[in-house]
Amino acid sequence: MLYLDANATEPLRPAAQQAALAAMRAAGNPSSTHSAGRAARHLLESARESLAAHFHHRPQDIVFTSGATEANALAIHALGASRPMIIGATEHDAVRAAAPGAAILPVLEDGTADLDALAGLLAVQPGALVCLMAANNETGVLNDIAAAAGICAAHGALLHVDAAQSAPRLNFDWRTVGAASVAISGHKAGGPMGAGALMLAPAYAEGLAPLQKGGGQ
């Protein structure tokens, strides 16, 4: 079969499959101090460090999730709870569903976010959480994330970026993004389904409010 839908879900790469199988064979609670727990912790933190190195970020500021949907929801829950919300008109349903009362940022004729309109919305709602995808999952349109981040910073707003579509295909470098948080997904990059991460600016990683409360691990 000739598979032509990799931008929706990329087939599992052999290296990712081998890594996943190796992790599944590790029986241990990463929070335990016995040998099996330490081995599991090593696997977990090695993966975090590898991801951080790839995106030029700090390992301690990366939270693993079940995918970009959860990463987007976590960012909106944790960063937007006490802020007005602004989301792009063409955002993924995962963002739209997590922020039902958000103001809508229109797009231009070419499908990119209207950054003049963003400045206007932030003049009325300073300090908002703005959610903007780096690359549209249906059209492939690329937004100017750096410019959007600059506008947000000028108005005391935070920017959350859904990079599920762009991170595997473009040279995505955390140092040039200027966002408070970025969501990524494993299955868009040849990884297993059910794997993703939320990358956070250091100021927002510590004390992140969880979606679900439970044990410390």
Predicted regions mapped to residue ranges:
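Pyridoxal 5′-phosphate
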Residues: 1-217
